[in-house]
UniProtKB/Swiss-Prot annotation:
GO terms for biological process: epithelial cell proliferation involved in renal tubule morphogenesis; phosphatidylinositol 3-kinase/protein kinase B signal transduction; response to wounding. It is found in: Secreted. The keyword DNA-binding does not apply. InterPro entries: DUF4634 (IPR027957). It comes from the Eukaryota. It comes from Homo sapiens. This is Uncharacterized protein C1orf54.
Amino acid sequence: MDVLFVAIFAVPLILGQEYEDEERLGEDEYYQVVYYYTVTPSYDDFSADFTIDYSIFESEDRLNRLDKDITEAIETTISLETARADHPKPVTVKPVTTEPSPDLNDAVSSLRSPIPLLLSCAFVQVGMYFM
């Protein structure tokens, strides 16, 4: 019990000692004061400009229209032979519409089954394993 009593009083004295060879710092050297300034801009001098350039949208629409453009022939009448005295019955051709050919993604998605592709990949892997 006496040891505990001595320890309780001795620890604050040991920790709180000041050493004579220690240099003392002045208060102005001890505290480092840093000032931070925040600059808030004033937007009163600027006028708001909310104009939108629609030329990008127009060119995109034009490109989309060209992609989906359907060429139509005007309905014409064609005579298969040179003109005779008696005019034969003319042949009437209806307009032909064409659409762009499907790209590679459409062709791949129209495959019936991926099983042959998977089997061939599996055979290649097994062959590489046994080599």
